[in-house]
Amino acid sequence: SGALLVNSRRFSVIETVKDSEGQVFVKIDNADASTDFGEGTTVNQILDWNTRYKYMRTHTALHLLSVCLPFPVTGGQITFEKGRVDFDMPESPDKDQITDRLNTMVEADYTVSYDLISQEELRERPQLIKTMSVKPPQNVDFVRLVRIGNSNKIVDLQPCGGTHVKSTSEIGKLFVSKIEKKGRINRRVSVVLQD
């Protein structure tokens, strides 16, 4: 989210995607034939902090959701309005109970920190990987681990390259907005921030 500044022209970023080979593509508005993005062109990024921060809060909330629902993760998505995770679980959970558990973890003000783990150690600890469809990068020596918790209690520990808040209290109040059945054993759980 944000904009690119190129040769004194401002282009709003519409979408950023990464392909299967790790190349990043940025879709912008107002580009035309006169737009010069040749090699060596200086490009400045202008970050939309409010949007980025909302994504960070939602992303971290989805980590907590994966703690509340300790089932394999089959998919997920974050938009400006909500975040969702698809779980491999046969029965739907109770929305109110999950909402209460999420808000309890938010209010606990757990620290979010990072460690690095070698590929070899990750292979020895496969239980750290919660996602069934998205695997941690295989072409790097070390993978970043996200740790949510404090010295007394680790709430979540898993490989993740996303953006997160520094503490769960930054997430703020949230609620489970919808639980959908997506196939015989898939449940899609959507979470919305209250502000």
Regions flagged by a language model, labelled:
Residues 1-195:
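Active-/binding-site microenvironments in catalytic and ligand-binding cores
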